Amino acid sequence: IGQNHQSGGRFGEPAVTGLSASLKEIGLELGRLKTGTPPRLLRRSINFDKIEVQSGDEPVPYFTNWKEDLFHVEQSEAANNRKLFGWDRDQKFHVEHFNKYPPESILDKIGSQIPCHITYTTKSTAEVIRANLHHSPLYSGKIHGIGTRYCPSIEDKIVRFAEKERHQIFLEPEGATTEEIYVNGFSTSLPFEVQVQMVRTIIGCENAEILRPAYAIEYDFCFPNQLRPSLETKVCQNLYLAGQINGTSGYEEAAGQGLMAGINAARRVNGLDPVVLRRDQAYIGVLIDDLVTKDTTEPYRIFTSRAEHRLILRQDN
């Protein structure tokens, strides 16, 4: 934040520099990347009357295609999973679906989703940022890691797209039981007092209070060409890496790697060959193949443009 910097882990947790040192000791080469997070605002300090409501999808879309109000997953349905993981015993389980929201969930209790809101920066926002760029660690040289190409900080947006008079901002509730509002599209590392000025130039946020300031993060990652297609490290047998440590950015990217690393770790324990998806079989196959065969110089995201077999990878096929 500004000229202040300190080591740390996830929010409120200590740093894990010892883990990085251990990975280096076994022969893994590490690099540095950067990311950022926006400020969190107090919900009741925002004037929502001045901004646009963006409601969630109704009905709520689920990852499953099963639409029945109630369904059961029997052992026959799970047979392929048992084979995949190498289980040699029956895995009995029962799953229930419901009408609208998960039983006993927050959504079930309050009976509806909480909407997001769309607002915009103003000319005053850009003026405050330009006047304080010299305080940003991203521009003063304190941070050297490469950031995510498609999630620029608000400083980068103002500098790189100087012709734009405004930038879209999403105000997203952190949850139903908190007053925190996540200001999506407003990542910054400017000093706190500057952040207060910046936030109050956003439409609807003229009197907003910051509960948690924005900050930039520089973190270690393992160059993923040191991994096998199974996501096992080449230098240390039985060690599998998945997610941001492999130089990726994004929830789906991390989830896909975690799925494959978990499957292959379980299969290794059971003495089975690894599962490796090809580029013509799945986007996970494209993702992992790119990681282990190409040089990663910036946080990696998966796109349809990266898949030469994109027409046969469509979800509608």
Model segments located where?
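A glycine-rich dinucleotide-binding beta-alpha-beta segment and adjacent secondary-structure elements
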Residues: 155, 170, 176, 182-248, ...
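An anion/pyrophosphate-binding glycine-rich loop and adjacent beta-alpha core
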Residues: 21-196, 293-317
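Non-catalytic terminal regions with compositionally biased, polar/charged low complexity
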Residues: 259, 265, 273-317
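Predominant activation on well-ordered alpha-helical scaffold segments within soluble catalytic domains
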Residues: 17-24, 126-130, 195-199, 218, ...
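Short, conserved loop/turn and helix-capping segments at secondary-structure boundaries
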Residues: 9-17, 188, 255-256, 278-281
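Short acidic, glycine/serine/threonine-rich loops at helix termini
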Residues: 1-2, 35, 42-49, 220-225, ...
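Glycine-rich phosphate/pyrophosphate-binding beta-alpha loops
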Residues: 244-252, 308-311
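Glycine-rich loop(s) and the adjacent beta-strand/alpha-helix scaffold that form part
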Residues: 1-41, 202-203, 207, 260-269
